[in-house]
């Protein structure tokens, strides 16, 4: 079973996202800050991190950069209310970001995007 970490400082968002992912057949780990995410990644192996950008303390940008350098095999997707330009999004994708998911999202969209990210990861691992 694929394991996903959901990182957001809003407990309601974490709970909703966890519920949707668990109903989709995924194992879910949660964190409420960038620092907590990085601590948990030291101990737990995950396939994907769904990461909010705007959090107190360490931002999602900083967390993404640290994960990308230390564990490039772990996929990261941003979940955010922040709209970014297509140019900026492409730069992030070129730097290794797996996806940029706008909040609010519906459950089908979230599961479709997560399924696609993890399918691409599996295909690359098998190649």
How would you label these PLM feature ranges?
Residues 105-114:
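C-terminal output helix
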Residues 55:
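Receiver (REC) domain active-site loop signature in two-component systems and cognate sites
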Residues 62, 82-99, 112:
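Alpha4 helix (beta4-alpha4-beta5 surface) of REC/receiver domains from two-component response regulators
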Residues 52, 80:
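Active-site residues of response regulator receiver
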Residues 45-50:
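Active-site beta3 strand of CheY-like receiver
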Residues 39, 61-72:
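Short amphipathic alpha-helix used as the core "switch/output" element in two-component signaling
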Residues 11-29, 95:
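Two-component/phosphorelay signaling modules centered on CheY-like receiver
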Residues 32-33, 59-62:
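Acidic catalytic/metal-coordinating carboxylates
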């Amino acid at each position: 079973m694929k394991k996903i970490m959901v990182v957001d400082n809003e407990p309601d968002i974490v709970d909703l996202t966890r519920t949707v992912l668990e109903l989709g057949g995924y194992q879910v780990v949660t964190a409420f800050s960038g620092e907590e995410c990085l601590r948990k990644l030291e101990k737990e192996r995950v396939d994907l991190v769904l990461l909010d950008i705007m959090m107190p303390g360490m931002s999602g940008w900083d967390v993404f950069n640290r994960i990308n350098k230390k564990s490039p095999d772990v996929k990261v997707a941003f979940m955010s209310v922040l709209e970014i330009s297509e140019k900026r999004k492409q730069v992030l994708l070129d730097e290794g970001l797996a996806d940029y998911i706008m909040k609010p999202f519906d459950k089908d969209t979230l599961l479709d995007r997560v399924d696609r990210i993890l399918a691409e990861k599996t295909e690359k691992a098998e190649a």
